[in-house]
A protein has these predicted regions:
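LysM (lysin motif) carbohydrate-binding repeats in extracellular/periplasmic proteins that recognize
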Residues: 46-76, 118-120
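Bacterial N-terminal signal peptides
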Residues: 8-20
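Gly/Pro-biased beta-strand-loop elements
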Residues: 92-148
Length: 148
C-alpha cells in the first residue's frame, strides 16, 4: 500500500515539475501592422541566484539573458545587481497561426485559434537546439497526433 502511495506521489510531484517547465509567456496578439510584443524589464538579482535561474523564472533562454547582460557574471551576478530581462520580441514574418519556430532567435511562438470572445493571443517559449552543428529541418509541418 505504501509503495503505491509513493509511486502516485512521485508522479504527482513529477507532473507538477513538468507543468512548471512548460509554462509560456502569453501576450495579446497585436494588430497585423504591429510586429512587437512585450517590453524590456529590469529586476534585481537575489543572493545566490544565477542568470540561468532568472532566465528560467522569466521564460527566457540562456543565450537571451546572457547577451542582454554582458559584463555580468552569469554564475554569480551578486545580490542587488540590476538584470535586464529581454522580454520584448519581434514576431516572425509568417502567418500568425499555429506553431512558428524562429530558429535564429531560439524561440517558439504559438498562435492558438481565437477564444470564444474573439480575443487572439500569442504564447512564446524559449527553445534550445538538440546538438551543436546538427541541422534543423526546415519547412512547413503539421501535428497529426498527440499522446499523453
Amino acid at each position: 500500500m505504501l509503495s503505491l502511495f509513493l509511486k502516485r506521489l512521485r508522479w504527482l510531484l513529477l507532473g507538477g515539475t513538468i507543468t512548471n517547465i512548460a509554462q509560456a509567456t502569453v501576450y495579446p496578439l497585436p494588430p497585423p501592422d504591429t510586429d512587437v510584443i512585450g517590453e524590456i524589464k529590469v529586476i534585481y538579482a537575489r543572493k545566490e541566484e544565477t542568470l540561468l535561474d532568472i532566465a528560467r523564472d522569466h521564460d527566457l533562454g540562456y543565450d537571451e539573458i546572457v547577451h542582454a547582460n554582458l559584463g555580468i557574471d552569469r554564475w554569480a551576478p551578486g545580490e542587488g545587481t540590476p538584470i535586464v530581462l529581454p522580454t520584448r520580441f519581434i514576431l516572425p514574418d509568417t502567418p500568425r497561426e499555429g506553431i512558428v519556430l524562429n530558429i535564429a532567435e531560439m524561440r517558439l511562438y504559438y498562435y492558438p485559434p481565437p477564444s470564444a470572445s474573439g480575443e487572439r493571443v500569442v504564447h512564446t517559449y524559449p527553445v534550445s537546439i538538440g546538438r551543436m552543428d546538427w541541422k534543423t529541418p526546415m519547412g512547413l509541418t503539421k501535428v497529426v497526433g498527440k499522446e499523453v
